Amino acid sequence: MIVRALRAHARGATGDIVLLWVVAAAFVLSTSMATSVPAELAEAPAGVRAALSAPFSAVLATYGAVLAAVYASFRYTVDRRDGVIAQRLMLHPRWVTLLSRTLGSALGGAVVALAGLAGGHIALAVAMGGVPVGWASVGSALAVGAGAGLWGLGAGIVVQNHLVALFVASMSLGSAVLVAMFWSAAAHGFPLIALLDAFGFDVTAVGVSPADGSGGSVPVAVGWMLAALVAGGVTFMKRDVT
């Protein structure tokens, strides 16, 4: 039953226009970082270039996370509007459909994050004459993107309206960067900063001081993801989706 639901979701993903557009947006947005890199850095030693490019990993992960949440929320609201969710519920139990959507949102979020990483590294390679790729940070960025996809799915299920869901999904993550400008300690309690910190990113690159945090980013991140999944899951199981 679960396998059939996953296969049906995978077949629908082959023509996922929403994913295509968000992946393109992540790639283009990440390549824009090249405009902020001074041309003189291309002639700097390799060690200097590597040190200066390290903070960009957190920035790229931030871009990817926000857009991953946007993708997952919009993907759900579009499918609900077009009757795809109602059709799937005629074939599978609600919990099976919810599970397949959850896995699909996490995978889609990771794909969006990967596109952002690719665009960013290409931009840095062109602007700085080549920089090493930290494969550990790549895996962490994909995990952050997957987590953000789950967050976006929860927002989409609860809110349902297209525009409102897009706003809630993006601002509930991106607002952490704005809060960090005025109250760095409070920013550690936001989902985005907790995710970045939990997966080892240098949060100082997005304006947050590690000294301001309590060191409990992992339970905070897990708590936020569980809250999003529980809220979305309960709503999905009880609400009419037609």
PLM-predicted stretches and their roles:
Residues 220-242:
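Junction motif at the cytosolic side of a transmembrane helix
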Residues 74, 78-82:
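Short helix-terminus and kink motifs of transmembrane alpha helices
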Residues 87-95:
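Short helix-to-coil transition segments within interhelical loops
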Residues 12, 77, 89, 152, ...:
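Helix-capping/transition residues at the boundaries of transmembrane alpha-helices
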Residues 2-14:
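A short amphipathic helical element positioned immediately N-terminal to and/or at the very start
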Residues 17-19, 23-74, 98-163, 169-171, ...:
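Secretory targeting signals
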Residues 178-197:
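Extracellular/periplasmic helix-loop junction at the C-terminal end of a transmembrane helix
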